[in-house]
């Protein structure tokens, strides 16, 4: 019996031993860090020997640098979006432009030289190379005009760029350890780090911190392997911030747009001014883009300017892109040669008519490419204006999702004044509503203040309103629920202040304050049609002028002379001195 039990006991013992060994092995495997390393070429997504990864402010970019003849080149779109939006690439004429506070700097594709206004400089190797859909710019050239630093590393090739000079959480490594792809000892190793290596902490976890090494590797490291983090302010001692100067007035701007449609209408300026109070800037609508070569048409008058000057009123001629609908303004602005012609024409007009200022009113600008070209136009024009003591103001819509490409901050660097067109909240073809409700204008001012200094903002205000006509789409239906405007044909017509008031009187309608819009509102019915109007009057005007006063804006502008009730000027001079 004992002889039979012995083999069974041995087998059982062996099984137990194997189980114990397996358990110990599993425990060892569980708590033993993997030595597997990550392929850094794959990690940085490098597919060819002439590529280099780009790590910008501790984030891996989707863009890649190109190594050409041992020089580092980066895509124009990357430069514009991530490093310095003031670089402007004209893909039509293959020229790279950069505008400083005082100079226009240009470099032609494949050229070693660049011009700073009239001086030519040698860069030593090609500055920019055109590609099928963009351009490649030498990173050293970008650095020359940008608040950035960069270092290059090998195995694999990568460029680590710093462009944001904020506080970071920094630490040093306490003992040799590894940076891993993810937090956990089983995650592959990205890089071995040594005692006293410097690390930037991007995010702190319970046991693992997300970090960036000085050579651009971003991964995870055990928290206990790091010293206590401390705040470190990044600085770039080699970069000197530009100083922008502006031609600004030491008084409130009270600007009135004077719509002039013929040469003969200029002779009426004495009567026009005599019906106002407090105006110190007149902006006549004299000039417009007239062809695709950048030439202007004008109906200006030296006598008009002389009369305004005799009354102590400056003249800021308005230049627009609206009158000649056959002209492709986008074409003019996206070609450097035609844009330059336009700027020269504007300056020639300013000299010829002795204008004190230039007011740019280019509208219907859509898309980033057109928007970038428009801002470049403002930069280049500003230099010419300032060199000749001429004030530059630019009319812009209120900030909205459809015009995010407008870099109002950079526009304000160059232009002296940014004029918010605080009207057309509702417009021909839209649903019925206020032309300029007080909450909408308030939001527009607040949004603009995030990008533009208060003393450079002029708030544009309407002297006009729209009367809306709502007709049921079924002829025999009466007007009932007008909240759902899809059931109605909506039309509108522009009215001056007095003409709108006359419509109320004719239709026995009474206006009352509408709390939502902050304006006086009236409605009436004729047959099966409903008419609505949000009035422009002293009530709405005073609320906007109070916005100017409360926010210490540079002043106000009014569209347009002749549409106002005469009483508004007493309200205006209460706020604009």
Regions found by a protein language model. Give the residues of each.
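SH3/SH3-like beta-barrel fold
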Residues: 98, 196, 208-213, 221
């Amino acid at each position: 019996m004992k002889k039979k039990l012995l083999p069974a006991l041995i087998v059982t013992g062996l099984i137990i031993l194997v189980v114990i060994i397996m358990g110990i092995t599993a425990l060892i495997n569980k708590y033993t860090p993997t030595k597997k390393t990550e392929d850094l070429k794959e990690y940085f997504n490098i597919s060819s020997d002439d590529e280099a990864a780009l790590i910008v402010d501790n984030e891996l970019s989707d863009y890649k640098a190109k190594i050409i003849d041992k020089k580092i080149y980066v895509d124009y779109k990357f430069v514009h979006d991530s490093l310095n939006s003031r670089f402007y690439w004209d893909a039509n004429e293959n020229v790279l432009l950069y505008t400083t506070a005082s100079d226009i700097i240009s470099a032609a594709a494949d050229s070693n030289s660049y011009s700073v206004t009239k001086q030519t400089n040698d860069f030593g190797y090609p500055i920019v190379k055109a590609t099928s859909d963009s351009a490649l710019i030498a990173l050293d050239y970008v650095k020359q005009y940008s608040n950035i630093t960069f270092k290059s590393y090998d195995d694999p090739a990568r460029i680590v760029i710093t462009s944001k000079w904020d506080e970071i959480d920094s630490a040093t490594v306490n003992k040799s350890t590894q940076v891993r792809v993810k937090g956990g000892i089983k995650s592959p190793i990205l890089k071995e780090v040594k005692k006293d290596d410097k690390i930037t902490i991007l995010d702190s976890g319970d046991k693992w911190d997300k970090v960036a090494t000085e050579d651009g590797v971003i991964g995870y490291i055990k928290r206990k392997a790091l010293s206590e983090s401390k705040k470190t302010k990044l600085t770039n001692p080699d970069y000197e911030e530009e100083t922008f100067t502006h031609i600004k007035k030491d008084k409130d701007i009270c600007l009135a747009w004077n719509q002039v449609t013929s040469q003969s209408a200029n002779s009426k300026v004495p009567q026009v001014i005599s019906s106002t109070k407090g105006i110190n800037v007149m902006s006549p609508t004299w000039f417009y883009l007239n062809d695709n070569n950048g030439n202007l048409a004008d109906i200006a008058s030296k006598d008009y300017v002389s009369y305004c000057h005799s009354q102590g009123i400056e003249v800021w001629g308005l230049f627009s892109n609206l009158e000649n609908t056959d002209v492709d303004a986008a074409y003019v602005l996206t070609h450097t040669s035609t844009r330059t012609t336009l700027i020269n024409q504007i300056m020639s007009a300013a000299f010829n008519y002795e204008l004190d200022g230039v007011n740019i009113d280019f509208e219907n600008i859509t898309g980033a490419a057109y928007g970038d070209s428009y801002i470049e136009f403002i930069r280049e024009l500003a230099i010419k204006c300032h060199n000749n003591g001429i004030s530059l103001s630019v009319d812009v819509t209120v900030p909205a999702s459809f015009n995010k490409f407008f870099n109002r901050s950079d526009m304000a660097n160059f232009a002296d004044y940014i004029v918010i067109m605080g009207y057309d909240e509702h417009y021909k073809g839209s649903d019925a509503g206020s032309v300029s409700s007080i909450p909408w204008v308030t939001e527009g001012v607040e949004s603009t203040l995030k990008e533009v200094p208060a003393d450079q903002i002029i708030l544009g205000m309407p002297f006009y309103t729209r009367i809306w006509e709502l007709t049921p789409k079924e002829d025999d239906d009466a007007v009932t629920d007008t909240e759902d405007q899809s059931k109605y044909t909506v039309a509108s017509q522009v009215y001056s202040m007095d003409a709108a008031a006359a419509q109320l009187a004719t239709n026995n309608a009474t206006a009352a304050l509408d709390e939502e819009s902050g304006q006086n509102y009236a409605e009436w019915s004729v047959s099966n049609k409903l008419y609505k109007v949000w009035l422009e009057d002293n009530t709405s005007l005073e609320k906007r002028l109070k916005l100017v006063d409360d926010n210490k804006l540079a002043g106000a502008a009014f569209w347009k002379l002749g549409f106002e009730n005469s009483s508004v000027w007493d309200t205006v001079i209460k706020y604009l001195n």
